[in-house]
């Protein structure tokens, strides 16, 4: 039957990508339908019960700055919070949280059910409705047809998923859930470039059978407890719990080696490539044979369960080998396994067949987000889902697509890497992937993106008002510090010596003093008995005040570096965003080698910047391409008309501070 209501956007899948996509589309005012095979698993954490980490936490903050749900749900469900790299520079500091699976999922479900313009429907999707070169809807397994102007596919590991435990295997999207076999077949019929990838998960352990007295305790940060969302509050957090640390040993490694003849990875049963940066324990033992021990983190799954996640022993070895290797580790000698570990193979589609909006180049209105694009991780999925949801909504509302640039957001880095370079293994985000990471910090994600989000229609009034209060306070106080001066006459020598190590010898602004190593905002404001501080409090709220002070300190201390990077961005941006015509035939570009023209015709980059990052496309080839465009008057700046955030001033030094 044809459902009587037509939607603007249909989102297929209710994981981290799908929920962010549906929420974003609905926030923009698009009539949105979220189709999931099981409403009870919306927002489910299928693997590790954690959010964030190096690079990943940056993505979560960006999703939050654009009005997304992941950070807020983590604040409601987080049972341990830590700031990683806290002793290092601000560019690489990152938030990580352990989450109670149930509380996190409950928060996501509540956000979905309370979101205007969003409908939920429980049915697996078996088919897409395609007319010519555009998608017009989706068909469920019982034949219900839903029509829409755009469809976002966020199928995770469900596309023709196959689960492996030892040499036994069976179809499944994850443990306990069916695979999307029919949908996978339909996508293959559409001739989209496709491959197979693999990921895995460790066995889960009953905490009542763990001897914690033999383990090293790893508490979270407690003074203060961090928050993930820019609107988050520490009092939102439930009870905080520690994690625990144990290690593998030579006996563990011998047990693993003895089982490799029954490993689906090492007997050729699994053909998909696994994640390099989250390898299985058997892969670790094989690749790092010289190491006699690996650290294993025992992470609580929640407040109302005894289940623990042993982070570091993802495996597809036979269950008897899993049991033996767990029992070989200190503190786990009597451990009971609640669920076996397994590997899962699944279909993904080459992201080079996508536009930077995450719309497929071949089928108008069809968007992909998450693991279907070859990524791994909740955070990468959520970020893609948010972007796909925004652009599906804009497509349905007949507005121009939007994607942040590499110098605007880690989300921009993620998408650009995917659509220009593709993947040969599951892709995960690191700070090292971003060339402008000093400007792309966790702490300034809102300064970079919230105004753009407001233009896009995904940032509500509450977030917008809070953002403006913070931005205005940072701006006013930074200006005050730059225009307030102290001299040898007005700053007593003993006070200057206490703060700076010696008296000052000429006039300094407070900003110049703050720029010195080891000098804090509070230290500068405390000079002359506090007279150098602001005349009235920057904020009544202690958490907001801390965020404002952090922004001010980083902006002033790193001003020179930030301005230098802004200059580099401006120089590189001269040609970076020059759009390439849709119908250009690269074999007609004089001087291009056959190999380069073939690659450009195959991957169809949208901009000169994207073309320059395709493997094998040389700087000389880019120069020839620029000459070709100039002669024919074809190139124009991407987003030079009305795309939100297109103005280069979005990334000025002032904005980055």
From Swiss-Prot:
GO cellular component labels: cytosol
Residues the record lists as binding FAD: 13-18
Keywords: Cytoplasm, FAD, Flavoprotein, NAD, tRNA processing
SMART domains registered for this protein in UniProt: GIDA_assoc_3
Region entry Disordered, spans: 635-657
Cytoplasm keyword on record: yes
Annotated residues for binding of NAD(+): 274-288
Alphabetized GO MF terms: flavin adenine dinucleotide binding
Biological process (GO), any one: tRNA wobble uridine modification
Listed cofactors: FAD
Superkingdom of this protein's organism: Bacteria
Compartment(s) of residence: Cytoplasm
InterPro entries the UniProt entry points to: FAD/NAD-bd_sf, GIDA_C_N, MnmG, MnmG-rel, MnmG-rel_CS, MnmG_C, MnmG_C_subdom, MnmG_C_subdom_sf
NCBIfam families assigned to the protein according to its UniProt record, in alphabetical order: mnmG_gidA (TIGR00136)
Function: NAD-binding protein involved in the addition of a carboxymethylaminomethyl (cmnm) group at the wobble position (U34) of certain tRNAs, forming tRNA-cmnm(5)s(2)U34.
Subunit structure and binding partners: Homodimer. Heterotetramer of two MnmE and two MnmG subunits.
Protein name: tRNA uridine 5-carboxymethylaminomethyl modification enzyme MnmG
Lineage: Bacteria, Pseudomonadati, Pseudomonadota, Betaproteobacteria, Burkholderiales
């Amino acid at each position: 039957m044809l459902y009587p209501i037509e939607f603007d956007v249909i989102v297929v899948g209710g994981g981290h990508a799908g929920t962010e996509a549906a929420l974003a589309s609905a926030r923009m005012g698009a009539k949105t339908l979220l189709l999931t095979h099981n409403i009870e698993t919306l927002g489910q954490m299928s693997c590790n019960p954690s959010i964030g980490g190096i690079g990943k936490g940056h993505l979560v903050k960006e999703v939050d700055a654009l009005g997304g749900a992941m950070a807020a749900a983590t604040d409601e469900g987080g049972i341990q919070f830590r700031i990683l790299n806290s002793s290092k520079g601000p560019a690489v500091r990152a938030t990580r949280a352990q989450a109670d699976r149930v509380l996190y999922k409950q928060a996501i479900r509540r956000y979905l059910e309370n979101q205007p313009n969003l409908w939920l429907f429980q049915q697996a999707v078996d088919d897409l409705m395609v007319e010519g070169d555009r998608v017009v809807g989706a068909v469920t397994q019982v034949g219900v047809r839903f029509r829409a102007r755009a469809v976002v596919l966020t199928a995770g590991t469900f596309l023709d998923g196959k689960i492996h435990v030892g040499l036994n295997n069976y179809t499944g999207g994850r443990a306990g859930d069916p695979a999307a076999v029919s949908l996978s077949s339909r996508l293959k019929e559409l001739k989209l470039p496709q491959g197979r990838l693999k990921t895995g998960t460790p066995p889960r352990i009953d905490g009542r059978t763990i001897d914690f007295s033999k383990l090293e305790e790893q508490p979270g940060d407690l003074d203060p407890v961090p928050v993930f969302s820019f609107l988050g509050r520490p009092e939102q957090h439930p009870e905080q719990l520690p994690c625990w640390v144990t290690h593998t040993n030579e006996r563990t490694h011998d047990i693993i080696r003895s089982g490799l003849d029954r490993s689906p990875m090492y007997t050729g049963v699994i053909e998909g490539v696994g994640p390099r940066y989250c390898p299985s324990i058997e892969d670790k033992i094989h690749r790092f044979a010289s190491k006699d021990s690996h650290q294993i983190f025992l992470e609580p799954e929640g407040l109302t369960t005894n289940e623990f996640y042993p982070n570091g022993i993802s495996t597809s070895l036979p269950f008897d080998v899993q049991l033996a290797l767990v029992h070989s580790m200190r503190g786990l000698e009597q451990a009971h396994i609640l669920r076996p570990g397994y590997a899962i193979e699944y279909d993904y589609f080459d992201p080079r067949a996508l536009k930077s909006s995450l719309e497929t180049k071949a089928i108008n209105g069809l968007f992909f987000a998450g693991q279907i694009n070859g990524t791994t991780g909740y955070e990468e999925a959520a970020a893609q889902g948010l972007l796909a949801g925004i652009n599906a909504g804009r497509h349905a509302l007949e507005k121009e697509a939007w994607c942040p640039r590499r110098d605007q957001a880690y989300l921009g880095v993620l998408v650009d890497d995917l659509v220009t370079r593709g993947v040969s293994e599951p892709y995960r985000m690191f700070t090292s992937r971003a060339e402008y990471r000093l400007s792309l910090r966790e702490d300034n994600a809102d300064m970079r993106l919230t105004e753009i989000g407001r233009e896009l229609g995904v940032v509500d009034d509450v977030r917008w008002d809070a953002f403006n209060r913070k931005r205005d306070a940072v701006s006013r106080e930074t200006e005050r510090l730059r225009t307030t001066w102290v001299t040898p006459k007005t700053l007593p020598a003993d006070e200057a010596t206490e703060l700076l190590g010696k008296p000052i010898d000429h006039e300094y602004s407070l900003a110049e003093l703050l720029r010195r190593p080891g000098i804090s905002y509070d230290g500068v404001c405390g000079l002359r008995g506090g007279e150098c501080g602001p005349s009235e409090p920057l904020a009544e709220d202690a958490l907001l005040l801390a965020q404002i002070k952090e922004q001010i300190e980083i902006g002033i201390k790193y001003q020179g570096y930030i301005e230098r990077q802004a200059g580099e961005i401006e120089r590189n941006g001269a040609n970076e965003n020059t759009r390439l015509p849709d119908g250009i035939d690269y074999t007609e570009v004089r001087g291009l080698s056959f190999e380069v023209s073939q690659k450009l015709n195959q991957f169809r980059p949208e901009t000169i910047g994207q073309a320059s990052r395709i493997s094998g496309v040389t700087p000389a080839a880019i120069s020839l391409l620029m000459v070709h465009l100039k002669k024919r008057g074809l190139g124009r700046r991407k987003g030079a008309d009305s795309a939100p955030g297109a103005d280069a001033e979005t990334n000025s030094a002032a904005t980055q501070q």
